[in-house]
Amino acid sequence: MKVLNLYFSATGNTEKVAMRISEAVQELGCEVDTLKVTGKDLEIDILNYNFVFAGSGVYAQLPGTPLIELFKELMQKYRKAGEVKPTSPRRPSAYAVVYCTYGGAHTGINEAIPAVKYMGQLFDHLGYTIMAEWYTVGEYKTEKLRGHSVAGRLGDIRGRPNEEDLRDIAARVKGMLQI
């Protein structure tokens, strides 16, 4: 099984999750390409992969701008190539997990849901079966927002994602790849 682990991380929270995903995939003996989206040109053909993990932090209820731009480019590329078809028929042996890290200071997980749904649409349009949507709490790291890590709706989220969160991610990865 060929696995792609594609992510954007501005503060390091999503990168922690992405690295744990990569480790767990490798422990299962699968090949994995882990790629950080940076906003620079990234040549990737998602259709070369049987299983894709795609993640981002949540910024104003959406994935990071570099990931949004990449997904727009990919959607356009696949439309032109005729890979996006009416009714989005499922591709055999094509699976995806979309995930995010979020602080949820104002409305909790509801702030993160639009970001994950947005990311999932690329894969759904390409006929991938979306196996799961993962939401991992992550602390606010910028000086301006750091206070939200203790005063937000989710309570004290300092230090998250922590080792317990990352162990949970690894267990989920191992469960997903046993398809």
What are these regions (language model features)?
Residues 3, 13-16, 24-33, 47-179:
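FMN-binding flavodoxin-like domain, especially the glycine-rich phosphate-binding loop
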Residues 36:
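Short loop/edge segments at beta-strand edges and connector loops
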Residues 39-41, 59-60:
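Short active-site-proximal "capping" loops at secondary-structure junctions
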Residues 41-47:
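Short amphipathic alpha-helix with an adjacent loop that forms part of the alpha/beta core around
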